[in-house]
Amino acid sequence: MAFRNRMYQLSNVDDADADILNSHFAPNPRGQNHTHGRRRNTLALCTTKDQMFVYGSTPAGGAEWCSEALERSRPRAAFKQQRRRHVPRWISDSFRTCLPKPSGILKEQTVNEEEGNSRHRGKYDCDERIGVAESMNYWHGIVRTEEDGSKTLFLIPESWEDVHLKEGLVAIIDLAVDRLHCSKLVLFVDKNNSSLPYLVKSLHWVGFEPLPHLNCSDHALFGMEL
């Protein structure tokens, strides 16, 4: 069945070319904390509707998110012509079923549900779709602006098999705070995943807590205040 509600029609985000990940890029010369002339490894990318952020290593040995470096390293036309990434149907269905209402209330939503009250449509239109590419995983997300003006990032990975899950989650937390300006992060976890016990331990290690939800039978939700 076609999705009639734009809230659930996850816009395909610009895919990350394989040659970008693990490549080198120059630091942003505008930043005050970068060492000029040093090149850094690209560890992950985040694409939004209008921007692309690069997660790269630092001379000190850590990693951080920055913007604009990719724009300078490749022509804007090439950036615009990147292929579009297919959004798996199960990910769209997961957001469709378990994504809270803009008020923060988790409510049952079925594939036959109506478009919703007109007073909510403006809030749905404000939801921004993003994609985060790592070398071992790809995350589909929605950034929602809540009624109080705060932002929440909802994420579903294409795979939970990433052996570097903790490092990836730390990078995503930095992204949510420093670049997307979110105050809360929520992850959707498949309850049928064979690695669920390990995942729960990893999520608790990073600082996530289970969230109560209604009628979300296939997924467990884990959240963190940022």
From Swiss-Prot:
Q: List the disulfide bonds.
A: none
Q: Its GO CC terms? A: cytoplasm; nucleus
According to the record, the signal peptide region is none
Write down the InterPro entries for this protein, in alphabetical order.
Acyl_CoA_acyltransferase, ODC_AZ, ODC_AZ_sf
Q: Which domain of life is it from?
A: Eukaryota
Protein name in the entry = Ornithine decarboxylase antizyme
Could you tell me which SUPFAM superfamilies the record lists for this protein? Acyl-CoA N-acyltransferases (Nat)
Family, similarity comment:
Belongs to the ODC antizyme family.
Gene this chain is encoded by: spa1
Q: Which GO terms describe its molecular function?
A: ornithine decarboxylase inhibitor activity
Q: How does it assemble?
A: Interacts with ODC and thereby sterically blocks ODC homodimerization.
Q: What does this protein do?
A: Ornithine decarboxylase (ODC) antizyme protein that negatively regulates ODC activity and intracellular polyamine biosynthesis in response to increased intracellular polyamine levels. Binds to ODC monomers, inhibiting the assembly of the functional ODC homodimer, and targets the monomers for ubiquitin-independent proteolytic destruction by the 26S proteasome.
What the entry lists under Pfam families is as follows: ODC_AZ
Residue stretches in coiled coil: none
Among the GO biological process terms of this entry, one is:
positive regulation of protein catabolic process
